[in-house]
Amino acid sequence: MNKTWKKAATVLAFAGIALSATACSGGKAVVTYKGGKITESQYYDKMKESQAGQSTLASMIVSDALESQYGKDVTQKQVDKEYNKYKKQYGSQFDSVLEQNGMTASTFKDNLKTNLLTEAALKHIKKITPAQEKKAWKNYQPEVTVQHILVSKKSTAEDVIKQLQDGGDFKKLAKKYSTDTATKNDAGKLPAFDSTDSTLDSSFKTAAFKLKTGEITTTPVKTQYGYHVIKMIKHPAKGTFKEHKKQIDNQIYQSMSEDQNVMRSVIATVLKRADVSIKDKDLKNVLSQYVSSDSLSK
């Protein structure tokens, strides 16, 4: 499961167990068998003792609190857009990737919505400072467009570079050598990206940003996927901060979202505003990673 999928899978992963809304109502059987039965109350008692059950309850509380406070900021259209982005990225493997991660299309969409709600909470609760923007702008690189050829062996990449230096055609070499099936038949061309892009390996971006328009990497670029030969198609001037403020702010919030301490603080604020009250003393610590149990048991 790569970084992108992990991100999609989210801030709070849902265990695949549902707690009945009437779980503590008493003796209704959820399972019967020869000589006995398992009641809702028995099931509930076991569930609340388990880590999976407590994690599910915590996820339900956080998700409901986020929905209550920021639901107006997230539309189904946004959720569907995110879903279709991942579906396109994984292509024919999408269903198997869902299965490998223990998800259905429905639960994955739930997770995506939780992500979007969490992003909304982050942007409402944590405000960006001019100092943060100044620091981010210093390291910012605008959108560039590149071609690449991905191979599994360093020696193959070195051979491709030599052929290019001898006048070889990048498009033909990409089709012949590249193992990136998504780009090899399109001259190895990738979608434009800037330094805020989180889908590309950092070493790939670093190597690409050093190139001027028309230049090719003179040594193979190693990433988790193999070895790349990169050609810069378009490398524009940096421009002004005002032109890229939106991207800069998105980058800052992206960094915040990857900081566990920041996100724990955001969720804690959401829970305090929700005035959550844990009625079952056995579950008083279910949200202890965010807030003190004393503030929830009333």
From Swiss-Prot:
Lipid-attached positions, S-diacylglycerol cysteine: C24
Positions of N-palmitoyl cysteine lipidation: C24
InterPro entries membership: Foldase_PrsA, PPIase_dom_sf, PPIase_PpiC, PrsA_foldase, Trigger_fact/SurA_dom_sf
Membrane topology: Lipid-anchor
Enzyme class per UniProt: isomerase
HAMAP family given in the database record: Foldase_PrsA (MF_01145)
Reported function: Plays a major role in protein secretion by helping the post-translocational extracellular folding of several secreted proteins.
Name of the protein in its database record: Foldase protein PrsA 1
Organism of this sequence: Lactobacillus johnsonii (strain CNCM I-12250 / La1 / NCC 533)
Gene: prsA1
